[in-house]
């Protein structure tokens, strides 16, 4: 009976003895993965694994007893089995570390998410890839008479402002992102909609293509195009032409910062304001600020008047020949005849900055003097590029009410902080709120500062999204594995979030102000630069005619 039992046991464990390496590897792999199972998996496989473990332990026990306590010699297969068992564990560790990432990717790809789950938050890495796809098109094909074309959205569908009259528009973005493309597109449409277009560009010599776009539209509509260079030595217009004494005084006081200011320094500029009023009442028709400065400089600086500050400002403006022409362009006629004026300014020299502010202030005065009660004034579109160099109190006040006089502004700047960089006679926070409140149409290109990105993200509104929570477990091979179960919770996110605003490529912006915010791609109107477009009309050969007028020096009030 003993021999029969031994024979039965030997036959039972014979497969292991004959193939110790195969069963050793399988045993090591099986033990490793059983130990790696999580609690839920162990419960599911409890019966099967218990059976396998029982059989395995019985086999090994019998083999060990027969080898060490009987004449049956199977030590060599046992050594091979033990080595293979360890090798199986090592192979399992290596396999799990390599296979888990691949399996998780396959599971993620094949998993169909719940249809009730909302969209999640954005990933800036994926956004940059998606938004970098350029959409090429000809904007002229989409322009309509009674609507304003903005550009194509990310679905290649045109975006329009469905109003015949455009409101104030704000364009924000750093240099090189495409602000000029949107402004030139709007300017082109303003001309073909029979509006007067005035562009003031703070870049020296102006933009390379913007004047050409304006000229192209003017040629199409049979309108006059005028190019003005503030830095030129050629006399081009008289800033005081057709201006009343009150208008001249208000213009000089506002641009020269002579009025009351938040810092209280305006109290000490009373004598300068007195001289400004004196100039406004005494300047003769056809006379320029340069002429008046030359004739009355000593009078301003005298001990009786003590208006050296005003004299310095006036002397500075007198050096800008472009706005001191006794005969030249008529701003009144340009507005009345709905013509186009492109002004190339400069930002590096204070006298040119003041000249730009004077010019803009005078344009505002001419717009506001038109009758808007018994007739509807023609529309005037004023585009201000890098308009922080053109800010004055007159402009700030006009932004609130000038739409009633048939005008709208398109202002461009680089960041929200530019709006607080104002002259000393203005409050930066008040001006900031004025611009942000009255410019309901906004176009923002790539944001490079957090303040601007966060503001426009908040302005786009909020949507409900789902935040996903997953559990990560560490396996026996020290490999992290994402659990199959996940939790989804409702949260809020900006419709156009900060990641989108930071990832916008060139020629791509976010459009706000007409329904939901949209991604818009703006392509340029094709033009070729030419010297003829930038030719400046020279009025210096015209005969100077100054209307005689008696000046009463004693009457300075």
Q: Across the structure, where does each feature detected by a protein language model lie?
A:
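N-terminal short leaders/motifs
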Residues: 142-148, 286-293, 465-469, 475-476
